């Protein structure tokens, strides 16, 4: 039997927390949390800035007690702020991330990494360093090369090294990929190391598969035109069937992307559900 025969043929992705909201009874915050469901497993990708994702999940009739894995994209507080609340709620899930996620992080002078990271029970964590198949059809990409230096988003961010701060190049960042064996979808929370760099890395792993969905934040809401143009130009020759933007992409850049690529581009607001296929 081909191992790809075990890959899920259906994925459901629900945005539990994001900057915007339209659904009645839901709330928004500056952060991101995605719920991913296959016929056999349930995952969480980031926890937003607070426990809001838990409250929104309840409104959406999603039981987070059943989540098998929590994948953390990087250490910023708007993606890990609900970590403590999740670990209290769910006693069984394994947390998967890079070990450098616990490094102290800053935006300018303000600390914005994992809150009270020293109090977290790391026995529940699984640290990854290289491409990893977490579950059949679900891959982690923690090794993102900086092939396009223009499409990087490090400005104003720092990380603590020994006793001093240095510019943060986001060694802790990781992307999540879902595949059914014939097409792949990329979930990237903030893309500090560049969404086009992430795509190139995933393309190396799945060179013959179709590019089904690109979902997440591109960190271009305040970016200069050169950075936006670098991404748009890349999509001209390698564009997924659907681009679901959110969070740090910015509504203005969402509108610009839609001008370029039309109905392929949608906004991934709080409460939105995307199904694959």
Regions found by a protein language model. Name each.
Residues 5-24, 155-167, 216-220:
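Glycine-rich phosphate-binding "P-loop"
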Residues 76-79, 167-185, 190-270:
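Cap/insert and terminal regions of metallo-dependent hydrolase folds
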Residues 100-174, 266-277:
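Metallo-beta-lactamase
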Residues 42-45, 64-67, 79, 104-129, ...:
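Conserved N-terminal glycine/acidic-rich loop preference
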Residues 52-101, 204-213, 239:
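Active-site metal-binding motif and surrounding structural segment of the metallo-beta-lactamase
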Residues 17-20, 47-50, 75, 100-101, ...:
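Active-site metal-binding loops of divalent metal-dependent hydrolases
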Residues 11-14, 42-43, 69, 93-94, ...:
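Structural motif
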Residues 9-60, 169, 173-188:
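Conserved beta-strand hairpin/beta-sheet module of binuclear metal-dependent hydrolase folds
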């Amino acid at each position: 039997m081909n191992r790809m025969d075990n890959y899920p043929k259906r994925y459901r992705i629900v945005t539990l927390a994001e900057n915007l909201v339209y659904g009645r009874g839901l709330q928004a915050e500056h952060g991101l949390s995605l719920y991913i469901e296959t016929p056999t497993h349930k995952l969480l990708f980031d926890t937003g800035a607070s426990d809001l994702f838990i409250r929104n999940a309840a409104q959406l009739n999603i039981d987070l007690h059943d989540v098998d894995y929590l994948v953390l994209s990087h250490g910023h507080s708007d993606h890990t702020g609900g970590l403590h609340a999740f670990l209290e709620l769910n006693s069984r899930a394994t947390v998967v991330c890079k070990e450098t996620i616990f490094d102290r992080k800053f935006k300018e002078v303000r600390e914005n990494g994992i809150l009270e990271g020293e109090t977290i029970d790391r026995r529940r964590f699984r640290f990854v360093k290289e491409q990893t198949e977490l579950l059949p059809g679900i891959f982690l990409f923690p090794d993102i090369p900086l092939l396009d230096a223009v499409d990087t988003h490090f400005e104003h961010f720092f990380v603590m090294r020994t006793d001093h701060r240095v510019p943060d190049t986001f060694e802790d960042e990781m992307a999540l990929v879902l595949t059914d064996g014939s097409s792949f979808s990329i979930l990237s929370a903030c893309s500090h190391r560049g969404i086009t760099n992430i795509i190139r890395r995933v393309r190396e792993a799945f060179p013959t598969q179709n590019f089904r969905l690109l979902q997440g934040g591109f960190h271009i809401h305040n970016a200069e035109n050169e950075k936006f143009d670098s991404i748009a130009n890349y999509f001209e020759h390698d564009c997924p069937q659907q681009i679901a933007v959110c969070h740090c992409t910015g509504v203005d850049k969402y509108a610009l992307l839609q001008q370029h690529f039309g109905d392929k581009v949608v906004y991934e607001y709080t409460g939105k559900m995307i199904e694959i296929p």
